[in-house]
Amino acid sequence: MSMEEISSCESFLTSSKPYFAMISLQFGYAGMNIITKISLNTGMSHYVLVVYRHAIATAVIAPFAFFFERKAQPKITFSIFMQLFILGLLGPVIDQNFYYMGLKYTSPTFSCAMSNMLPAMTFILAVLFRMEMLDLKKLWCQAKIAGTVVTVAGAMLMTIYKGPIVELFWTKYMHIQDSSHANTTSSKNSSSDKEFLKGSILLIFATLAWASLFVLQAKILKTYAKHQLSLTTLICFIGTLQAVAVTFVMEHNPSAWRIGWDMNLLAAAYSGIVASSISYYVQGIVMKKRGPVFATAFSPLMMVIVAVMGSFVLAEKIFLGGVIGAVLIVIGLYAVLWGKQKENQVTICELAKIDSNSKVTEDVEANGSKMKISEGDNSMLSTIVISVPLSETHLKKTIQEP
């Protein structure tokens, strides 16, 4: 191989790393959903699972936070502690417990599809808390609004409409066998539908809590901008303590805490190490190199992987309403992501213009240049460039005098 071929091959491998990392991460998330579903079906308490998951995550992340971020740690004031307390409550406690309950009552594929509502819900909360401003004249703003509406419509469709079973060629025989027992299980249909509706509502609340965590985390990240591992460790640790308190109140059976070398231990360890530790590190690297939009764009892949794995491992049935709703959610997701990407591009261009104008103004002032106002006919306009502090307006205004 020539040097050019070796160089192009190395360049291809380097550019492919973010794609490989995000695809691998989606397989990891898919495995977590399948393993957790099996564990919950065998009787594992979701309250206990949340405790073990975040205790393991804390134990895994804490050493890295200590060795890499122990210098110049931010001081934990009462205000910061309350923010950490709320983040621990929103993430490990509310989000995870509601998600696991919803997963127990529905299916892994359905749960993954509903989790794709996250960007739309985050956008709604950001608008309500005035973290994002709406400009209906801009195409990117229209895309985010339309994507949010389509995403919510898809979620509602998945919740209220099942429809016929969608046959996959490798599950057709299993579904025929299941239909032979339809008469003996018809009495369970009404209760099953109620559980499905309950699970759908729980998943919506879980996604809402997750989106709320992102909105609040954006504020505290200003303090922990250089200590993100420490922030994650604190959230997991505080969330673990809160989850223990909630479990003592909600779970009165002491044997629920017992765990052996079984699927329950695998679910707790896998979730804590892969979903709450490795995923954070991988996503952080990818987001720094390619941005958050790139990282989020791979989330629908997890739904496809879970659908295939679930049909094999759990003999999961896929309904037409779920397929149509999932397609709508994915369309809405990419519309929101496209709008967000365009908004970021516009913001970067504006900041670049401001920065270049600022440098020009500084050079002029440094050289002691004086601005000259040309006087001429009434039709001619004189222009004065006024430099305004960036922190006040973020713009340079051009004033025209008659």
Curated annotation (Swiss-Prot):
Spans through the membrane: 20-40, 48-68, 74-94, 109-129, 149-169, 196-216, 229-249, 266-286, 293-313, 318-338
Keywords of the record: Membrane, Repeat, Transmembrane, Transmembrane helix
Domain of life: Eukaryota
Keyword Transmembrane helix carried by entry: yes
Location of the EamA domain: 29-159, 208-337
GO MF annotation: an example: transmembrane transporter activity
InterPro entries per record: EamA_dom, WAT1-related
Cellular location(s): Membrane
Membrane topology, as annotated: Multi-pass membrane protein
Pfam families per the UniProt record, alphabetical: EamA
Entry's Gene Ontology cellular component terms: membrane
Family: Belongs to the drug/metabolite transporter (DMT) superfamily. Plant drug/metabolite exporter (P-DME) (TC 2.A.7.4) family.
Designated name of the protein: WAT1-related protein At5g07050
Record organism: Arabidopsis thaliana (Mouse-ear cress)
